[in-house]
């Protein structure tokens, strides 16, 4: 490494200097090794890992690798033992020519952290090239007049090796005339010459064949030979002589063709043709015969090709001057041409990618790539500086001479810029300067930093009921700004339970397309609104997701035919037997057909038609179009048939309409043969006060108590529900949309069906409370104000009724036959308040046309819905002291009638009773107290047939 002489330095001090020197070499990041050329594959060069201070176990994890600009495949490192070895054939002459120094520069790169070490491996020469003569045969013309000791220069051999391996010795084959004078020192300045030992005698020996052998100084020795053909000439005994034996000339490498290098001059002391000289080129080294020309007459040497300083810095030209004597004589000289450098080479840029692509969350100062620059020129022309494209989040950092690192300068965002095209510019210091560029494409790798996003927070979907299983009802789509698997969105249901069933039993979502399918036919009567959430989640790590709300409204279809309710004659749909006295007059109600429809809206609006009698005969009966009441059209007489078979067609208003047929058998009897129920009815009709003492009065009282308890329970339950955290239900936030199958006239199935349940502004009004079991979620406060109808004091939010609130078996037997809405029903908000159109229950009237134009009460409400009604059933208001015609039983569509009829009218006691306003209730109580005596008298006759209820 270095040598030290002991000049008074002690051994400890010398060791300290050696230790400091060793630390200096390690800190500089350079190692030096040597290897012989032509070494076999696997030849040991050095323990590079140990010398660099690296552990063998960390070579592979730290991506230990060796790189070389031009000779990367000659040497390799075994990552198992950290040994640098020969990987392929090394030819020193091919690498460095005859340069005295020859080394291979390596870059050792390791990651985590990134470190770069520089290693120089010196290639030692071996004797692998024999001496070579440029010609296989050299011809010499020697005049016989030559004196002894005359010298004849020969072209020596060349050896591609260096130092001792290129040190040549010559020997001449045995002969009596010539000896060989060869160079004896290492520099070999002395020319190889053939020396004449004694005079020649052409007549005796006109020609000589000699062999010159060149031997190098290597071990083992290698030799080369050339044949010398010596022809002995006569007379001409003076050689041409140059002014100098050697010439030195400097020439710019960009010299143009035909540029004069120099003009040689040789003279011959002979006279005549023996003194005329011609010039010729013997050799130009190295390989420059095509670069120069020599005029054989005037001795001018000119440029004939393109000179390149980077290829050869010197040329050696051997020139021979020959006279025209017989035999001709020759003189020799050497011309040394030095090539001067010009800035004719652009810099070269080499980029080694290390960390591409770059993650968008990479930290600043992250090394992206290594860049090396070089320039084949020398001096200032070979000094190179680098620059980078401006306004990019990267920068160049110089790590070593002509080596740079491309590092991250600021944060990246792939969603803004997904790739950068960087231009590295290398510029030399020449005048004018030359430059070169290299492009580096830096792709930004995606990181999962964006969640899938839906276009809307919620969607409203309308689906008709009875859809086929697997029906596609909607498609959700979410967009993810990331790329590849980070943008691969999959969809799934946010599972929850709907009652006792899981949401996944109703709908499913295709994981890839986002298509929402109904797994089973939906039933409007069972489920009007299906609200659920769909989750979109990407495939990144960790995955990100978002939810969207779907409100699926199930639209009603006319899929339920009218159903006849049970009558006193037997099961539903059976024939009803009625006995009618012949003495009744026109308008007498004989019977009432009761039917319900499970559909809603127009699909549940029922109408009744009396089928024509057989044979086309006219019958004295008709049926109310919407009431189902069968009444007489005229007074009966003896001419009428004693038995009538009436077929009543019950039809809804759906498309197509569905029907049911009820059979009523009417028997005309004499007044004395009428049943007791009819007698009781007649008595009640004759005495209006006696009807109030009927058992129905007790039923009214019981119903009032039960209804009050139900209302109180409902209000308490609603208050507790609204005070809790709203999730889903009557008080939950959202944007409900009501589904309306159609709207006709002044009636529509709209927001008017709602009444406030859980408002924070005070107790609800008692004028009307309407509950629907399948309305969507309530509005928020802003939307409540927008949707509130004029004249309405409080916006309402419906709630699902308790499924336990059902009418009893005794009440179910007397359910009203036709439940519908009045077209002109009037709701009064209070004294002087504005009137509103609200769905009500029509009162049965003796007039056949009364209430027959009303829309259905079940528009959107099934048979399990229940409604409190306070107010009249038609525009006609009850007068003071009058009782309301009907009351609606909470939890049941049944109507109990307490309407008073004329004495000659027969009213079916199965009509349901409706509740009037508070004032009317008080009036009824007064009437009840005023008729206590009559109530006791009629107590024995108060038992009625349950079928009439």
Swiss-Prot record:
- Keyword set for this entry? Calcium, Cell adhesion, Cell membrane, Glycoprotein, Membrane, Repeat, Signal, Transmembrane, Transmembrane helix
Residue stretches making up the Cadherin domain: 30-133, 157-242, 243-349, 350-454, 455-564, 580-677
Topology with respect to the bilayer: Single-pass type I membrane protein
Basic and acidic residues bias: start-end ranges: 780-789, 908-922
Q: Which GO terms describe its molecular function?
A: calcium ion binding
Sequence ranges on the Extracellular membrane side: 30-696
Subcellular location, principal? membrane
Describe where the PXXP repeats fall, as residue ranges on this chain: 733-736, 773-776, 795-798, 831-834, 872-875, 890-893
Compartmental location:
Cell membrane
Q: Where do the segments described as 6 X 4 AA repeats of P-X-X-P lie?
A: 733-893
> Can you name a GO cellular component term?
plasma membrane
The residue ranges for the Cytoplasmic side of the membrane come to 718-949
Endpoints of the signal sequence: 1-29
Checking Pfam families in the record gives: Cadherin, Cadherin_2, Cadherin_tail
- Residues carrying sugar: 265, 304, 547
rRNA-binding recorded as keyword: no
Which residue spans adopt a coiled-coil conformation according to this UniProt entry?
none
Q: What GO biological process term is on the record, naming one?
A: cell adhesion
Transmembrane segment boundaries: 697-717
According to its UniProt entry, the function of this protein is described as:
Potential calcium-dependent cell-adhesion protein. May be involved in the establishment and maintenance of specific neuronal connections in the brain.
State the name under which the record lists this protein: Protocadherin alpha-11
Lineage here is:
Eukaryota, Metazoa, Chordata, Craniata, Vertebrata
């Amino acid at each position: 490494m270095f040598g030290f002489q002991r000049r008074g330095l002690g051994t400890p001090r010398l060791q300290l200097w050696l230790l400091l020197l060793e630390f200096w070499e390690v800190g500089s990041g350079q190692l030096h090794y040597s290897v012989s050329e032509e070494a076999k594959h696997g030849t040991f060069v050095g323990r590079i890992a140990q010398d660099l201070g690296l552990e063998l176990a960390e070579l592979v994890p730290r991506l230990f690798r060796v790189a070389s600009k031009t000779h990367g495949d000659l040497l390799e490192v075994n990552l198992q033992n950290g040994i640098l070895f020969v990987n392929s054939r090394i030819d020193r002459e091919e690498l460095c020519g005859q340069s005295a120094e020859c080394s291979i520069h390596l870059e050792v790169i390791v990651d985590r952290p990134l470190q770069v070490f520089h290693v120089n491996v010196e290639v030692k020469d071996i004797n692998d090239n024999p001496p070579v003569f440029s010609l296989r045969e050299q011809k010499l013309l020697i005049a016989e007049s030559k004196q002894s000791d005359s010298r004849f220069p020969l072209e020596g051999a060349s050896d591609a090796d260096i130092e001792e391996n290129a040190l040549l010795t010559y020997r001449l084959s045995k002969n009596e005339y010539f000896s060989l004078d060869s160079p004896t020192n290492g520099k070999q300045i002395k020319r190889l010459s053939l020396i004449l030992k004694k005079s020649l005698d052409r007549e005796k020996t006109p020609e000589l064949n000699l062999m010159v052998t060149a031997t190098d100084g290597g071990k083992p020795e290698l030799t080369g030979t050339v044949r010398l053909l010596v022809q002995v000439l006569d007379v001409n005994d003076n050689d041409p002589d140059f002014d100098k034996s050697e010439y030195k000339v400097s020439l710019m490498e960009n010299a143009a063709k035909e540029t004069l290098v120099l003009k040689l001059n040789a003279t011959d002391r002979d006279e005549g043709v023996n003194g005329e000289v011609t010039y010729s080129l013997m050799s130009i080294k190295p390989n420059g015969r095509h670069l120069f020309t020599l005029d054989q007459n005037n001795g001018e040497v000119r440029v004939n090709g393109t000179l390149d300083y980077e290829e050869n810095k010197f040329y050696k030209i051997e020139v021979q001057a020959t006279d025209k004597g017989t035999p001709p004589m020759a003189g020799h000289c050497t011309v040394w041409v030095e090539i001067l450098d010009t800035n004719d080479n652009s810099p070269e840029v080499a980029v080694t990618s290390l960390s591409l692509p770059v993650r968008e969350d990479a930290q600043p100062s992250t090394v992206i790539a290594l860049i090396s620059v070089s320039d084949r020129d020398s001096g200032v022309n070979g000094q190179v500086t680098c620059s980078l494209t401006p306004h990019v989040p990267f920068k160049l950092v110089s790590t070593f001479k002509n080596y740079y690192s491309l590092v991250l300068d600021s944060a990246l965002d792939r969603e803004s810029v997904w790739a950068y095209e960087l231009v590295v510019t290398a510029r030399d210091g020449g005048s004018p300067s030359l430059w070169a560029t290299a492009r580096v494409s830096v792709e930004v790798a995606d990181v999962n930093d964006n969640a899938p996003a839906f276009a809307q927070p919620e969607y409203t979907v309308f689906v008709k009921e009875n859809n086929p299983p697997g029906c596609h009802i909607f498609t959700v789509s979410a967009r993810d700004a990331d790329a590849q698997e980070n943008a691969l969105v999959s969809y799934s249901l946010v599972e929850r339970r709907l009652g006792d069933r899981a949401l996944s039993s109703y709908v499913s979502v295709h994981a890839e397309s986002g298509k929402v399918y109904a797994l089973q036919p939906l039933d409007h009567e069972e489920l009007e609104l299906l609200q659920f959430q769909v989750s979109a989640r990407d495939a990144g790590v960790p995955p990100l997701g978002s939810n969207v709300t779907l409100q699926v409204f199930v639209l009603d279809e006319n899929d339920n035919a009218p159903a006849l309710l049970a009558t006193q004659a037997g099961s539903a749909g059976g024939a009803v037997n009625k006995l009618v006295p012949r003495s009744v007059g026109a308008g007498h109600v004989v019977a009432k057909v009761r039917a319900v429809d499970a559909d809603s809206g127009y699909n549940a609006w029922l109408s009744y038609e009396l089928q024509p009698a057989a044979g086309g005969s006219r019958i004295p009966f008709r049926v109310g179009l919407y009431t189902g009441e069968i009444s007489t059209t005229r007074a009966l007489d003896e001419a009428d048939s004693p038995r009538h078979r009436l077929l009543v067609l019950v039809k809804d208003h759906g498309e197509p309409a569905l029907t049911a047929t009820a059979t009523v058998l009417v028997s005309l009897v004499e007044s004395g043969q009428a049943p007791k129920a009819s007698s009781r009815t007649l008595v009640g009709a004759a005495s209006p006060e006696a009807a109030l003492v009927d058992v129905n009065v007790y039923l009214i009282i019981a119903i009032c108590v039960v209804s009050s308890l139900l209302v109180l329970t409902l209000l308490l339950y609603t208050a507790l529900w609204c005070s809790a955290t709203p999730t889903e239900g009557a008080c939950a936030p959202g944007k409900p949309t009501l589904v309306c199958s159609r709207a006709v006239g002044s009636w529509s199935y709209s927001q008017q069906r709602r009444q406030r349940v859980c408002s924070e502004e005070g107790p609800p009004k008692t004028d009307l409370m309407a509950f629907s079991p399948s309305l969507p979620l309530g509005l928020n406060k802003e939307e409540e104000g927008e949707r509130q109808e004029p004249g309405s004091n409080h916006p309402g939010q419906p709630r699902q009724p308790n499924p336990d609130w059902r009418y009893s078996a005794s009440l179910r037997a007397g359910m009203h036959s036709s439940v519908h809405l009045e077209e002109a029903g009037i709701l009064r908000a209070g004294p002087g308040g504005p009137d509103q159109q609200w769905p009500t229950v029509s009162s049965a009237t003796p007039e056949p046309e009364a209430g027959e134009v009303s829309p259905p009460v079940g528009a959107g409400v099934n048979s399990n819905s229940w409604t409190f009604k306070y107010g009249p059933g038609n525009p006609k208001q009850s007068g003071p002291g009058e009782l309301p015609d009907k009351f609606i039983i909470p939890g049941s569509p049944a109507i109990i009638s307490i309407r008073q009829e004329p004495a000659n009218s027969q009213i079916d006691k199965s009509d349901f009773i409706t509740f009037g306003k508070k004032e009317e209730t008080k009036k009824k109580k007064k009437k009840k107290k005023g008729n206590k005596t009559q109530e006791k008298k009629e107590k024995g006759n108060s038992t009625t047939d349950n079928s009439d209820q």
